[in-house]
Amino acid sequence: MSKAPVRVAVTGAAGQIGYSLLFRIASGEMLGKDQPVILQLLDLPQAQKAVKGVMMELEDCAFPLLAGMVATDDPNVAFKDADYCLLVGARPRGPGMERADLLTANGAIFTVQGKAIAENANENVKVLVVGNPCNTNAYIAGAAARKVGRTNPNNYHGMLRLDHNRALSQLAAKTGRPVSSLKKMVVWGNHSPTMYADYRFCTSNGDSVKALVNDHAWNNDVFLPTVGKRGAAIIDARGLSSAASAANAAIDHMHDWALGSDDWVTMGVPSDGSYGIPAGVVFGVPCECKNGDFKIIQGLEIDEYSREKINKTLGELEDERAAVADMLK
C-alpha cells in the first residue's frame, strides 16, 4: 500500500539553496524513494514569479513522488499541516551591516515563522534552520513556538551538518581514507568560524583517525581554520555562497532525523545541559537518530583543549542570545 504524502515547507524557495534543494526532495532523496511529498513554498511577494518558474521546472521533471505544490508569501499558508520545515530564507548581511543588525533583522523573520509553525504545522513537525546565523535563528524560532505550545521545542534545529561534511572531506584527504569509512565525527557549537570540529573519537575501519593524523599543528593551524572558513573561501572562489553543498547538508540532516542513521551525526539542537552547555542554547552536538527521533551522545571526554574550543564557540552563541533577548520577551 502506498504511503500518504507528507508536507514539506521550504522558505526562500526562489533562492540558490532552494533551487539546489527542491528537486532532490521531490526525487525522494530526503525522505525515501517510497514517500510522496507535497511541497509548500514560501518566499517574499517580489519573488513569487521566480517561485512559479521553479514550480514549472519541478512539474517538468515528472517526479513520481511529487504529489502537489503550493506557492505563497503567507507563512500561515506555507506551514499549514507541515511535517517538515526547512527554513532557508534569511536576511543576508549587507555592506556596512553590523552582526547585531543582522541578528535583529533575522529575529523579526524567525519570530514570525516560529509562531506560524507552532500555530499551523503538524504537532510533531521537524524544523531545520539553514538561513544564517542558523543556531540563533533556530533559537528564536523555537522561543516563539514555545509561547504558542503544540509543537515540540526540541525539534527546532540549526544546521551544523555542512561543517560536519566539510570536516569529513578534509580528514579523508589528510588520511587517504575514503569518506565512507569515517565514523563518529563531531562538530561542537555554532555554525561559524568558531565551530570546533573534533575527530578525537573518529574511526576509519576501526583505526583511530586521531592516531592516523597524529599532527596537532595540522589540526590547530590547518584543519580547523579550513573547515571554519570554508564558506568564505567558496565565496572568494565562486563569487557566490555555497548553495549546493548547503542544500546537500540539509538533505542529510533531515534524512537521518526522519529515517535514522547508523553513525553519529552533528545536529544543532536545543541543549539539555549536556557537556556544560546551558539548557536551551542551540548548539552543535553529536547525536544518534532512530525511529524518527534523535538523542545526544552522552559521556564523551572533553579534554582541556576541547573545553577551550567549546567555550569559545559557546561564548559567541551566548553573545548572540543576549543580542536578541529583548525581542523574545
UniProtKB/Swiss-Prot annotation:
Substrate binds at residues 93, 99, 132, 166. InterPro entries: L-lactate/malate_DH, Lactate/malate_DH_C, Lactate/malate_DH_N, Lactate_DH/Glyco_Ohase_4_C, Malate_DH_type2, NAD(P)-bd_dom_sf. GO terms for biological process: malate metabolic process; tricarboxylic acid cycle. Keywords: NAD, Oxidoreductase, Tricarboxylic acid cycle. SUPFAM superfamilies: LDH C-terminal domain-like (SSF56327), NAD(P)-binding Rossmann-fold domains (SSF51735). Its EC number is 1.1.1.37. GO terms for molecular function: L-malate dehydrogenase (NAD+) activity. NCBIfam families: MalateDH-SF1 (TIGR01759), PRK05442.1 (NF003916). Belongs to the LDH/MDH superfamily. MDH type 2 family. Catalyzes the reversible oxidation of malate to oxaloacetate. This is Malate dehydrogenase. The gene is mdh.
